Amino acid sequence: LMNKLKDYYDVAYDLICMHEFVLSLEKLKREHAVSAMDIAKGCLDYGIHPPTMYFPLIVSEALMLEPTETESKESLDQAAQIFIKLYETALNDPEKLHNAPTNCYITRPNEVEAARNPILTYQFEND
């Protein structure tokens, strides 16, 4: 997966890895205003779980991809194609990623509002 993506994204540590690797989207953010969060939220529109965002902290705009050892080659190839599509979208239509996800029940929440005013319990409707 890392080898398929390194022609598109900057790999933070281009070394042999076991199953996880880190991408840095610093250049993508600087040149196209697309952040690691934008790409992660875009994953949701393609039905894949987003990678870990902003970790490790020493990598700017980090995305940590950690496919499990049980993933098939086909599913890894499909994930690579999705990340390549997201990269191309970042170059050609960054606003689409700024609004992602659009195909989910809950679209992009206001992260600052959610952090400042968390709702920690669900309020059931009265019957």
How would you label these PLM feature ranges?
Residues 1-127:
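Non-catalytic terminal extensions of PLP-dependent enzymes
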